[in-house]
Amino acid sequence: MTASIVYLNNVRLETGFAKDHHELTYTKTARYTLAIQEGKIQAIIPQNQVTEKQQGTDLNGQLAIPAFQESHNHLDKTYLSLGWRASQPVKNLKERLADEASELKLLAPSTEQRATAMIEKLIGYGASYIRTHVNIDPYVELENFWGVKRALEKYAHVIDYDIVVFPQHGLLKNPHTVLLMREALKNGGTMVGGLDPAGIDYAIEESLETIFDLAEEFQVGIDIHLHDTGEVGVYTIDKFLDILEERKFTQRTAISHAFALLDVRPAEKEKLYQRLATHQTAIMSTIPYDPRYLLPPIDVLRQAGVSVHLGSDGFFDSWSSNVSGDLFEKLRNFCEMTGKITEEQLTQAY
């Protein structure tokens, strides 16, 4: 049976740019009716051409924009629904991991409840897609995975999602971790994650090869965290792309954070950026507002054809007390940090 068509009338859409009498650029808009069937826009009809049969819900000129994609998140880490608690300061990533490990077992039973609260907040901010990394580790094994999976399945009619099985406390440190990763991928994990093959696993090649082994076994994509900077971080990105090329890997690939992209030698930048673009390896940034971290060169990457996506990372968890989960706020931060002020620049960023 064919689903009926839903009509949204008097929807304001952007149509282009124009200049006013002061030669200032502004965005032109016009009103339309959107014909939607089975969740997809089937037709965009100028409002003055709408027939009686196409009358539906009047949106009174509200502006319609594409839904947001929450491209880097940790649904299992949030404290949402448990009441207020602040994060504890640490000196480095290893201290942060130790701090997190101390509370993992306490938080695990409430994973579904907490993830549900976070999903609802993200949907409220306009997200129609969530890519969440979920801890797979010896402390909680698959408990967080099952809780997040149940939470996401409740909203499958509203959002699309990916579950990245993520060895937050190292892929190679405990032989049980790879077995747990494999079990999660058998049961609904959609991507393989990783964490700092040098800084955490101390074995760049072995860590990356293991990640690609898992991805090939289950025919899924890869999205690794890479905080390592300097030549080590750049080498890791190069080695990631080398392995991708050697294996002729065709699933989706992404590198999250990728701070080392700022440390690429000038003579090598064009080649590396082109490799990322050629293999459609996306960069996932959380627009860190933190002087200890550096924003990857997003504008230069995009000009080189590299796909860049934004996410909130974790918010209201042991890692951060401050992030809201509002992706529009992330975009504003990005525009402020990179000096985007003109109508064209703002529109392109959004």
Predicted feature residues:
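N-terminal metal-binding scaffold of metallo-dependent hydrolase/deaminase domains
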Residues: 1-51
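C-terminal helical cap
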Residues: 11-16, 122, 277-282, 286-292, ...
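Alpha-helical scaffold segments that flank or form the walls of functional sites
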Residues: 64, 81-133, 139-154, 180-186
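Histidine-centered catalytic micro-motifs
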Residues: 66-78, 134, 221-230
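Active-site gating loops and adjacent loop-to-helix segments of metal-dependent hydrolytic enzymes
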Residues: 79-111, 236-254, 272, 324-338
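Active-site core of metal-dependent hydrolases
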Residues: 165-174, 186-295
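His/Asp/Glu-enriched, well-ordered alpha-helical/loop segment
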Residues: 246-253, 299-350
